[in-house]
Amino acid sequence: MATHYLSPSILCIILTTLVSIAGAKIPAIIVFGDSSVDSGNNNFISTMARANFEPYGRDFPGGRATGRFCNGRLSSDFTSEAYGLKPTVPAYLDPSYNISDFATGVCFASAGTGYDNSTADVLGVIPLWKEVEYFKEYQSNLSAYLGHRRAAKIIRESLYIVSIGTNDFLENYYTLPDRRSQFSISQYQDFLVEIAEVFLKDIYRLGARKMSFTGISPMGCLPLERVTNLDDPFSCARSYNDLAVDFNGRLRRLVTKLNRELTGIKIYFANPYDIMWDIVTKPNLYGLEISSSACCGTGLFEMGFLCGQDNPLTCSDANKFVFWDAFHPTERTNQIVSDHFFKHLKNLFH
């Protein structure tokens, strides 16, 4: 019988991974969602929804544009670091990472996606069901790397961060005619909640037990929505904010239902509405100055390719701003929001 030996370098990598896993209360952060948590997956698919160019990432370690729709790190990155894991969660499709990197954290999120498959179709990004397929593939690779028992423990003990939903309304329902012709806004919310339930049950069946499930923020206060608010120009669009409150209420009821029905599951509903409303309306309390416009360009409508390095109007200090581009928060805002939720997460999941 042939005897197989692990090379010292491979053995060292595995041992380092195991020590990291053993030393953390949560062994890994596993992320699903949209641009609020996409750490670069869209760099590796054919889509216009990318942020892998300057000035994106200018405050990221090394000043690299990683594909994060931010000047620096995302809330999921800060949560990973707060749990004693690595300071950034790598994108699953990034070939510069491998399963040893993903053993303590992995991101399947895709900027521009939503609960609704038709939302992903708008910009040709990864639909939520495909994120789940990548998760299955990841589980198989993790088992091959660490063995089934140890991999299953990581899957069971990891914290799952889910952040998605805004695009379904702003990119799809209120922009394109198809869903509006099929659903009233109340019916569409119910449709999305049904998809959310199927998704959460799917990852539960795949082993997920600890989840931070994020609602949607006051999307009427995004700079892009302020500038297009015809009823009250440059003010928060109240109808969109009211919708966010309504939708978050439906998501909260879903979380209550699943926590009651699914054995062993614990879902924390991370409702970002109140903290983001507080930051937007009272930025000075958080060491910020400007919330009505963004850092990039004019701060009113630029995001993605419109937020290019040649735009002379881009601010010099993003730490003064709530928003980085017309749709996404700055690194500083992401850190504030992450810190806010971590106070609850650290007591729930350990």
Curated annotation (Swiss-Prot):
Record's subcellular location: Secreted
UniProt enzyme class: hydrolase
Any one of the GO BP annotations: lipid catabolic process
Assigned EC number: 3.1.1.-
GO molecular function: hydrolase activity, acting on ester bonds
Source organism of this protein record: Arabidopsis thaliana
Name of the protein described by the UniProt record: GDSL esterase/lipase At2g42990
GO CC, any one term: extracellular region
Keyword list, A-Z: Glycoprotein, Hydrolase, Lipid degradation, Lipid metabolism, Secreted, Signal
Active site: 35, 325, 328
InterPro entries hit by this protein: GDSL, GDSL_lipolytic_enzyme, SGNH_hydro_sf, SGNH_plant_lipase-like
Glycosylation sites: 98, 117, 141
Family that this chain belongs to: Belongs to the 'GDSL' lipolytic enzyme family.
Classification via Pfam families: Lipase_GDSL (PF00657)
Signal peptide: 1-24
